[in-house]
Swiss-Prot record:
It holds the Pfam family ExbD. The accessory proteins ExbB and ExbD seem to form a complex with TonB. Involved in the TonB-dependent energy-dependent transport of various receptor-bound substrates. The lineage of its organism: Bacteria, Pseudomonadati, Pseudomonadota, Gammaproteobacteria, Pasteurellales. The gene is exbD. This is Biopolymer transport protein ExbD.
Length: 145
């Protein structure tokens, strides 16, 4: 019978790489948030830092309020915001289908508590693709006579 002089670490490395892949995939899903919201597009969008999401207020298309991905009633939200420091950073994530009235309600709650450091989460608006294809005549804007 053959005696092994060394420990074979190749299977150990294989297992560690699989675990690393699982952790990376899981971490990417966690950072995206759990609540599906179709935010509006804006041309002047700026990337956010991780600390900017310290207080995240969300309104879904069903007009439901969420605070840091936890469902909350309007009354609970008013009580929660009242405990915040006036210099608190707040991010608003509002679905594009939400009535403007709900957005105003949310900003009114913040304004009543003198919270002024507010960011609105939007999607980066992409430039429209050229409508002409290779080999087709370019479109010329019409000029009124």
């Amino acid at each position: 019978m053959k005696k092994f002089d060394e420990i074979n670490i190749i299977p150990f490395i294989d297992i560690m790489l699989v675990l690393l892949a699982i952790v990376l995939v899981t971490a990417s899903f966690i950072s995206q948030g759990k609540i599906q919201v179709n935010v509006p597009k804006a041309s002047t969008t700026q990337p956010m830092k991780a600390d900017d999401l310290a207080k995240l207020l969300t309104i879904t298309e069903n007009n439901e309020f969420f605070f840091n991905d936890q469902a909350i009633t309007k009354e609970q939200l008013i009580a929660e915001v009242a405990t915040w420091d006036k210099s608190q950073k707040v991010s608003l994530k509002v679905d594009g289908a939400v009535a403007f009235e709900k957005f105003v309600e949310l900003t009114d709650i913040l304004s009543a508590n003198e919270i002024k450091n507010v960011a609105i989460i939007t999607k980066k608006e992409t430039a429209p693709a050229p409508s002409s294809t290779p080999g087709s005549p370019a479109q010329v804007p019409a000029v009124a006579p």
